[in-house]
Amino acid sequence: MGKNVVVLGTQWGDEGKGKIVDLLTDQAAAVVRYQGGHNAGHTLVIDGEKTVLHLIPSGILRENVQCLIGNGVVVAPDALLREITKLEEKGVPVRERLRISPSCTLILPYHVALDQAREASRSEGKIGTTGRGIGPAYEDKVARRGLRIGDLFNPERFAVKLRELLEYHNFALQ
């Protein structure tokens, strides 16, 4: 049986987790991203080529490494698709090696609007958010009302849940 290695950060910032994971990836069969969003990035330099990743685990740049995005990650579909496209343009077979949990909560435009509006309304107590909707998406996840990746495969359910969410959040944006 293989062993599992877990890299945890406790500083909520640029601690070098990505670099450590990248160092360990040569010996890994899989790399799993279990939480977070596209607000942070990690830069990898492999064979002199620089790549910046925000959502996709760094193992994607290593042959034969499966990459998994777990349900604790909040996913901005537009950011994910941009990252996939950039990697595929470099010849990385992303679609063959990336698996995404259908339970991942989606970051939608209203999450971004809420995040930015809240930060703008704070006079002195700004928290320094990236304004990418991460916090509001996690609020929906914890409250069990968020749209998830799996909802994209059921258009009727997606439409009903989206309508409910827009009604819930629109009052805060008016």
From Swiss-Prot:
GO terms for molecular function: adenylosuccinate synthase activity; GTP binding; metal ion binding. One of its GO terms (biological process) is 'de novo' AMP biosynthetic process. Gene3D superfamilies: Adenylosuccinate Synthetase, subunit A, domain 1, Adenylosuccinate Synthetase, subunit A, domain 2. Keywords: Cytoplasm, GTP-binding, Ligase, Magnesium, Metal-binding, Nucleotide-binding, Purine biosynthesis. The active site is at D14 (proton acceptor), H42 (proton donor). Binds 1 Mg(2+) ion per subunit. This is Adenylosuccinate synthetase. The gene is purA.
